[in-house]
């Protein structure tokens, strides 16, 4: 019992976490358009539901026809209460999400996160043949299971010249990548303020919400430059 209590207090340091990525809109659209059938199609569609709603697996995997509705003004939305925090959220439905929901008569497929995590990597690996950005590598950390496998000689992971573990982007995608992707892409639209975005994701803490925005330093620099150019075109000069 004492050991269990001690173990429950252990927290994974940020430096020990696997790399957390997001899929951009082009990658998501390519995934949406990818010809698939059977279980693979269901896994793809369930993952995209998570991306388009910005929700956790526990919520986007449990949606039923009752959750798909409209506002009093006719806006198509997904209305439910988040399981983890008991927070009511009302994400809007984009065209892709609506078509996915219609495909299943608004009863989203029920798939375990274990199956989703296994299949989505294989699906994205195949998609990388036509979407090369999925073949970019990221420095990451191995899980305990992966470290044990490597120590036993069962597998050997790629490493860069500094000895750091690297993985292809498609191999870093999990069920929770859907939520990070949705939130990051929502942020990149520049259409919504923090309050509006947090109302969609269900976050109550702005600091935690911002941790979901997974932009690289280069992406942030590009975003700043784009805003500067817009400002210059509007006649505002001399900012830098």
Feature names for model-found ranges:
Residues 1-5, 50-74, 194-195:
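Short, charged phosphate-coordinating catalytic segments
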Residues 2-57, 114-115:
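Basic, Lys/Arg- and aromatic-enriched nucleic-acid-binding interface segment
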Residues 9-12, 62-100:
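Conserved tyrosine-mediated DNA breakage-rejoining catalytic core shared by Y-recombinases
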Residues 67-74, 172, 191-212:
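Short, polar N-cap/turn motifs at the start of nucleic acid-interacting alpha helices
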């Amino acid at each position: 019992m004492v050991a269990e209590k001690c173990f429950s207090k252990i927290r994974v340091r940020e430096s020990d976490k696997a790399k957390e990525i997001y899929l951009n809109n082009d990658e998501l659209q390519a995934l949406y358009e990818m010809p698939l059938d059977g279980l693979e199609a269901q896994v793809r569609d369930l993952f995209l539901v998570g991306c388009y709603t910005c929700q956790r697996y526990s919520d986007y995997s449990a949606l039923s026809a009752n959750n798909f509705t409209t506002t009093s003004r006719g806006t198509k939305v997904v209305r439910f209460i988040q399981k983890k925090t008991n927070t009511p959220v009302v994400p809007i439905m984009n065209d892709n999400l609506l078509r996915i929901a219609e495909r299943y008569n608004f009863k989203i497929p029920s798939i375990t996160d274990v199956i989703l995590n296994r299949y989505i990597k294989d699906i994205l690996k195949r998609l990388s043949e036509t979407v090369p950005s999925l073949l970019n590598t990221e420095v990451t950390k191995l899980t305990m299971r992966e470290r044990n496998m490597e120590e036993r000689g069962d597998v050997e992971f790629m490493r860069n010249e500094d000895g750091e573990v690297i993985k292809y982007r498609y191999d870093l995608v999990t069920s929770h990548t859907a939520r990070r992707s949705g939130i990051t892409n929502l942020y990149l639209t520049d259409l919504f303020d923090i309050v509006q975005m947090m109302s969609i994701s269900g976050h109550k803490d702005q600091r935690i919400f911002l941790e979901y925005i997974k932009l690289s330093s280069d992406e942030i620099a590009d975003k700043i430059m784009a805003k500067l150019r817009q400002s210059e075109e509007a006649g505002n000069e001399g900012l830098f």
